[in-house]
């Protein structure tokens, strides 16, 4: 099985990455496409970014600075050394609820390698990342209407690239089921009809006032927890995910079907 997650807007640029995975770093597969997008972003002033991304003045200043500092070339790729184009592996740079659940900082080498082989992180700038791909800080959500050589938005820019990359990775790892843990905004970049896989979308519901519903904060963390569960237990097929029980969640067969798997958590376990 192969998992998909969305990235995070918040970034962890300070915590040190465990040394045991440093030999497994890689460069983003679609980096040349990232260069084309960054060329456009570098031409934007902070006020332009503020309007384009609907962000505050402080965030627009920060991301304009990030854009100008972003640098990659064949001769000087990303590195974990301050003497080069300093970068950090994606699974450790992204912060927020999903990545709190995933918690790669606490993983041993074997679990980190498992995640790297079975997880793709969708990205507005990088297309689709492996967790151990080195990347530099950025902000570019997939839904951003950034005009480019292919059209008026990032969905037109990425076209079939994201889907083709996912298909190739699934073939390489003999995966036949895609576990969609990404948001609608990001999963829209995947051409479902061209995807050579069965798609399963887990749904996480929490009890509140006697009713079960999707609560964003909890659901995001549960998405990361599900990938962590698969890595910690070295799962080999999707059916094993129905045993997912971290943080009090349990699979509800009578509410699930082939495409949507429902997991619930009672109020007492929250």
From Swiss-Prot:
Pfam families: H2O2_YaaD
GO terms for biological process, alphabetical: response to hydroperoxide
Coiled-coil ranges per UniProt: none
A GO CC term attached to the entry: cytosol
InterPro entries given in the database record: YaaA
Family the UniProt entry places it in: Belongs to the UPF0246 family.
Protein name (Swiss-Prot/TrEMBL): UPF0246 protein Psyc_0554
Lineage: Bacteria, Pseudomonadati, Pseudomonadota, Gammaproteobacteria, Moraxellales
């Amino acid at each position: 099985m192969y998992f998909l997650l969305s990235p995070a807007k918040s970034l962890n640029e300070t915590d040190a990455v465990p040394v045991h995975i440093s030999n497994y770093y890689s460069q983003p597969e679609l980096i040349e496409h990232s260069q084309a997008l960054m060329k456009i972003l570098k031409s934007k002033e902070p006020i332009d970014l503020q309007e384009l991304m609907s962000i505050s003045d402080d965030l627009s200043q920060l991301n304009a600075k990030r854009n100008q500092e972003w640098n990659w070339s064949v001769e000087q790729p990303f590195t974990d050394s301050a003497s080069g184009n300093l970068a950090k592996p994606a699974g450790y740079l992204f912060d927020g609820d999903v990545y709190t659940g995933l918690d790669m900082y606490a993983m041993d080498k074997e679990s980190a390698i498992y995640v790297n082989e079975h997880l793709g992180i969708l990205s507005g700038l990088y297309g689709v990342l492996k967790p151990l791909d080195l990347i530099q800080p950025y902000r570019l959500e997939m839904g951003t209407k950034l005009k480019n050589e292919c059209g008026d938005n990032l969905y037109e820019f990425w076209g079939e690239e994201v889907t083709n990359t996912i298909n190739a990775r699934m073939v390489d790892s003999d995966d036949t089921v895609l576990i969609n843990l990404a948001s609608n905004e990001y999963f829209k970049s995947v051409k479902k009809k061209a995807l050579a896989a069965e798609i399963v979308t887990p749904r996480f519901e929490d009890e509140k006032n006697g009713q079960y519903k999707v609560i964003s904060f909890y659901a995001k963390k549960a998405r990361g927890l599900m990938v962590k569960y698969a890595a910690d237990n070295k799962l080999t097929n999707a059916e094993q995910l129905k045993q997912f029980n971290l943080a009090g969640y349990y699979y509800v067969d009578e509410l699930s079907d082939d495409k949507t798997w429902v997991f619930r958590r009672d109020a007492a376990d929250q």
